[in-house]
Amino acid sequence: MDVAKEKELREAEALMEKNVLLTSIDKVLNWGRGHSFWPVTFGLACCAIEMMAAGGPRVDISRFGYEVFRASPRHADVMIVAGTCTRKMAPLLRMIYDQMPEPKWVIAMGSCASAGGPFADSYSMLTGVDKIVPVDVYIPGCPPRPESLVYGLLQLQHKVNHPDKVRLLKHGK
């Protein structure tokens, strides 16, 4: 081992014995952001009912720190788009996204929000909200269960805590 590297490690160990933690500010901020999402709901169809069920006592989303659903996009950092998005609704979706402060993330909940679902061939439907806003996490299902929303939020938490890693965790690992 290099002498300079060994000296650096000894200094770090000495600081740790004095209860001094060395890390970058970005890691601390990302940890805080990942454990305290404030989602704004954009419920458009049946997926919104499952999103409301995720806030209920059976799923208990509050144990992860996500129970504070915001009515105003100016106080939120995660937008959950749940359900079908029509072409007439697209400008409103973009306006709400633009009102959110940085950093901000988007979750597309359900088949309709992700790829149009069974209405993909309709003239009035968008084939995915990623054509309007950048989507960070896709939750499949029609409609997805509340547990899937919790899993999607945990995937987003992992993505926020580890911005250098592109790959998300597999279920159960």
Curated annotation (Swiss-Prot):
Its EC number is 7.1.1.-. InterPro entries: NADH_UbQ_OxRdtase-like_20kDa, NADH_UQ_OxRdtase_20Kd_su. It holds the Pfam family Oxidored_q6. GO terms for cellular component: plasma membrane; respiratory chain complex I. GO terms for biological process: aerobic respiration; electron transport coupled proton transport. Binds 1 [4Fe-4S] cluster. Keywords: 4Fe-4S, Cell membrane, Iron, Iron-sulfur, Membrane, Metal-binding, NAD, Quinone, Translocase, Transport. Its cofactor is [4Fe-4S] cluster. [4Fe-4S] cluster binds at residues 46-47, 112, 142. SUPFAM superfamilies: HydA/Nqo6-like (SSF56770). It is a peripheral membrane protein. It is found in: Cell membrane. NDH-1 shuttles electrons from NADH, via FMN and iron-sulfur (Fe-S) centers, to quinones in the respiratory chain. The immediate electron acceptor for the enzyme in this species is believed to be a menaquinone. Couples the redox reaction to proton translocation (for every two electrons transferred, four hydrogen ions are translocated across the cytoplasmic membrane), and thus conserves the redox energy in a proton gradient. PANTHER family: NADH DEHYDROGENASE, NADH DEHYDROGENASE [UBIQUINONE] IRON-SULFUR PROTEIN 7, MITOCHONDRIAL. Belongs to the complex I 20 kDa subunit family. This is NADH-quinone oxidoreductase subunit B. The gene is nuoB.
